[in-house]
Amino acid sequence: MAKKSMIARDVKRKKMVERFSDRRAALMAAFHAAKDPMERLEIHRKIQGLPRNSAPNRVRNRCWATGKPRGVYRDFGLCRNQLRERAHKGELPGVVKSSW
């Protein structure tokens, strides 16, 4: 189980990304459309003025059951350990153990 503070920090980051996504997307579109270097520099400073945690790459994929940050399968949102346990119990529909 991950520390509760780390999970809470990640939840806070997700909320901040959601709150600033429109503003960040508009600035990024303007940045890529601008041709003048000085205009790009000005837009870049505005982007830097946004909160750091509003960048989507700062959000960590975590297991929803345990909060572990590593070995998380995107399709299920579970870490590898929980995926294995739940697949053995039959709690994941459509998942079968492979054999050949």
UniProtKB/Swiss-Prot annotation:
Keywords: Ribonucleoprotein, Ribosomal protein, RNA-binding, rRNA-binding. InterPro entries: Ribosomal_uS14, Ribosomal_uS14_bac/plastid, Ribosomal_uS14_CS. GO terms for molecular function: rRNA binding; structural constituent of ribosome. GO terms for cellular component: cytoplasm; small ribosomal subunit. GO terms for biological process: translation. Part of the 30S ribosomal subunit. Contacts proteins S3 and S10. Belongs to the universal ribosomal protein uS14 family. PANTHER family: 30S RIBOSOMAL PROTEIN S14 (PTHR19836), SMALL RIBOSOMAL SUBUNIT PROTEIN US14M (PTHR19836:SF19). This is Small ribosomal subunit protein uS14. The gene is rpsN.
